[in-house]
Amino acid sequence: MEERGFMEVETPVLVSVAAGAMAKPFTTHHNSLDRDLYLRIATELYLKKLIVGGLEKVYEIGRIFRNEGLDFYHNPEFTMLESYEAFADYNDVMEMVEHAVSTLAMEVLGTTTIDLEGEQIDLTPPWPRLSLHEEVKIGSGIDFLECSDLESLRTEMKAAGLDTGEQVSWGGLLDKLISDTVEPKLTQPCFLVDYPVEMSPLAKRNRHDPRL
């Protein structure tokens, strides 16, 4: 990251607002202030404040806490690298990520091909860029851009025989739809792009489609 001009920073772990991801936070209490606080579920907000404050490239490697399920892919406490860069878009970020992952694999393992649960995973860039909208339609037959509210999306999912759980927001329900019908089919490295604004409210809108 330093080679690309990024500055490593540290941001608060105890936060007053648990934001930056769709996840349930761990809650704690600050005795001196007599107020509830949360263990961060992401570093996004503070890193973006630094970008607004004039630091053009920042990143943090830190602990993240999410009070949710525990399985092969999820842990309530984990380490994450998150970065932000001014004057760049998601194309620049994707190039940076695939370069970093493939370079690390080569330096650590001596190869960009790894075995994961018996399947050969090829980390060689470039990775496919997949439209989220198209992948959801392929996986479920649902056009989420035609479902303007929570209940219409819930109705479409039930008609397709899909579990809607107890989601109370349109974005949360779509996230479940993606998890159930798209993610299980993605075995090789790729990028899902063009999420709806409801799922990425702090991201810049797509210049070609303001819904994304």
Regions found by a protein language model. Give the residues of each.
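Class II aminoacyl-tRNA synthetase catalytic cores and aaRS-like
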Residues: 2-212
